[in-house]
Amino acid sequence: TAAEVTTEAASESAAETSAAAGDEMTVTYPVTITDHLGREVTIEKQPESFVSGYYISTSLMIALGLDDQLVGVEAKADKRNIYKLSAPELTELPSVGTAKEFDLEGCAALKPDLVIVPTKLKDSIPAMEELGLTVIAVNPEDQTKLFETIDMISTAADVVEKGQELEYWISDALESLKKSLDGVETPSVYLAGNSALLQTAGPEMYQSTLIENAGGVNAASDITDTYWADTSYEQILSWNPDYIVLAADADYDVDSVLNDSALADCTTVKEGHIAQIPSDIEALDSPVPASFLGSYYVASILHPDVVTEDDFKTTEKNFYETFYGIKK
C-alpha cells in the first residue's frame, strides 16, 4: 500500500540526492561541529575510536556503520536486543556508566578519539576535557534534533553520505505516512510512561511528535512538563482519550490497564482501545533512527484501514535490514 516503504524506493531517493551533493560528501579536517549545548568542538583528525555514553547515539552509530570503531559504550549494553541482533560485539565492550553515573576515568582510560554523550552530562564535560577528551553532546529529542545528531556524528566520522542516506530514508518514510493519513480524523491518544500508567509525555517530548506523525493528537498537549509528567486517574477520565498507548518499555501491560477498576468508566477501556508500542528489536518510542517506525505502528492502531499492520512490518523489515543488517 501507499504507506509501505520499500528498500528500493528509499535507496533510489538517497542515491539521487547523494549524487547531486557530489564532493561535499568528504570531510576535510580539522572540522568544527556545534553540538546541542551550543559548544563549538574542533575535531583535528578523523577519529578512529569512539566512546558512546548513550544508547541513542550507540544505535545511531550502528546505522552509520561505525560500530566496529566503538571502544566503550553505555551501561547495560548486554540487555539491548538491537545490539545482540546487529552488533553483538558491543555487548562485550567496557561500560562507561550512565548519564547519572558516568565513569570519567574509565572513559579516559579507553583513549577514544571522540566521546559522544547526552546533554544531561553537560556538567561532566569540563572534567572530560581536562582529561584530554574531545566530546560532543547530543539531545535528539525531536525529528530536527535527531537529524542534527546524525549530521554531527556523520560529519565527525567522515561518513556524511551514509548519514544523508539514513536521513532520506526516514524522511521518505514519514512523507509517505503523511500522504496516506492526509484528511483522516485525528483521535486523541494518551501515551502512558515506562514506569507508571499515571505518567505521560507532554508536547515537548519526542513521543508527542510520534503521536502527531501517526495521525493522532496528544491528549496531554496542554501540560508544560518537559519530561514525563505525573498525572491522575481523574485527569485521564477528564481527557477521555480515544486510545491509550503504553510506552515500549512499560513495566505493566495492556491487560493490567484493561482490568484497572479506576478506569472502568473510560470509553477507551470499554472499547478495548489499548495498545503497546513494540520493543522486540528496540523501543520504537525512543529517539533512535528507527523511531519513525513507532509512528507507523501507532498509525496502524489508530487508522488500520489506511495503514495496515503489514505496512508497519514491511517498513520495519526493510529499514532494519538496510541499516542494521537484521533480517526479520
Stretches with model-predicted labels:
Residues 1-46:
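Short, low-complexity disordered leader/linker segments with a strong preference
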Residues 51-53, 69-74, 114-118, 135-138, ...:
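Structural recognition of the beta-strand scaffold that forms the well-ordered cores
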Residues 121-130, 246-260:
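A ligand-binding cleft/hinge motif common to bilobed small-molecule-binding domains
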Residues 96-99, 103-117, 133, 232-249:
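Proline-aspartate-enriched helix->loop->beta-strand connector
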